[in-house]
């Protein structure tokens, strides 16, 4: 039997399908490919959405989720796992069982609980509790925005207190993104060992974007798969995601879409911020 040698790192993604291509699985694939990795995907939910709103969604049967994932894990050397929208409590339980079987694989969890506009709930209280109990303790890096952070840790009187409360759930690193905060710049904070590890400031761009959280989390997962240590991966993924937003475009009647493939299309910009390490 001929041995198959991997040519690029493999990332396994659990996420929902977005027909607009702005968020969800398509966003994950584009960001992971941009990090020089191969994206494999497990669909957890089918959504009806456009660039303006999520109209409704249907969770994929949990047994099908399990079969999709195990088919990949038994065939390819997965180097990182990224989790986005999970769709149901049953899917949380299935993903938990898979993570338990592969404890050596780093996990990036973008805890999607509402649409980007915040108008549509994508996770009820039972699902939130299940994620916190079953997935957070097995997560290498958790990437909530500040609104999600306050939902998961409602007792904290400020973001640092909320972050410390969430770290008690067992995740190793926590990156809180500040897009929703009323600050001149976007301030993202990385926590580890119950302390602020670093703070990243980014120019606040005009307008709103569909799929920015998916883009950032998947880029980090791709860099994890490349073997990059967490602090550096978080910094470089933010550089990539911010450039994708800067070069974003509006082709629908709602939010702008990140241009995750800007590097392949060329640009009139002189920006050379995004450079992956050799």
Question: Where are the model-predicted features located?
Answer:
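Charged C-terminal helix
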Residues: 8, 59, 231-278
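Conserved phosphate/ATP/ADP-binding segment of small-molecule kinases
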Residues: 122-197
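Phosphate-handling active-site elements
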Residues: 36-40, 196-198, 223-237
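Short, small-residue alpha-helix embedded
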Residues: 31, 151, 207-230
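Conserved N-terminal subdomain of the carbohydrate kinase-like
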Residues: 2-13, 30-121, 266-267
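Acidic-glycine-rich active-site phosphate/pyrophosphate-binding loop
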Residues: 2-7, 13, 24, 184-199
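Short pre-catalytic strand/loop immediately N-terminal to key active-site residues, enriched for Gly-Thr
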Residues: 14-20, 197-210
């Amino acid at each position: 039997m001929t041995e198959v040698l991997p040519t690029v790192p493999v990332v396994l993604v659990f996420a929902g399908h977005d027909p607009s291509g702005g968020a969800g699985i398509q966003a994950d694939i584009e960001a992971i490919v941009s990090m020089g990795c191969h994206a494999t995907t497990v669909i957890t939910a089918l959504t009806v959405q456009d660039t303006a709103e999520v109209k409704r969604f249907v969770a994929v049967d949990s047994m099908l989720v399990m079969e999709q994932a195990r088919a990949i894990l038994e065939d390819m050397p997965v180097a990182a796992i990224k989790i986005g929208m999970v769709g149901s409590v049953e899917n949380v339980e299935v993903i938990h069982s898979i993570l338990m079987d592969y404890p050596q694989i780093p996990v990036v969890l973008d805890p999607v609980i509402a649409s980007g506009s915040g108008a549509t709930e994508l996770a009820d209280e039972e699902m939130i509790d299940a994620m916190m109990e079953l997935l957070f303790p097995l997560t290498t890096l958790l990437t909530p925005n500040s609104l999600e952070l306050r939902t998961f840790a409602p007792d904290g009187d400020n973001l640092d207190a909320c972050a410390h409360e969430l770290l008690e759930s067992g995740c190793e690193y926590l990156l809180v993104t500040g897009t929703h905060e009323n600050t001149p710049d976007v301030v993202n904070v990385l926590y580890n060992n119950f302390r602020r590890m670093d703070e990243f400031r980014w120019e606040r761009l005009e307008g709103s974007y569909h799929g920015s959280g998916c883009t950032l989390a998947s880029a980090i997962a791709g860099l994890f798969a490349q073997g990059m240590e967490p602090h550096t991966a978080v910094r470089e993924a933010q550089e990539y995601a911010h450039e994708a937003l800067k070069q974003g475009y509006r082709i629908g009647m709602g939010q702008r879409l990140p241009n995750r493939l800007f590097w392949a299309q060329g640009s009139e910009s002189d920006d050379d911020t995004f450079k992956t390490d050799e």
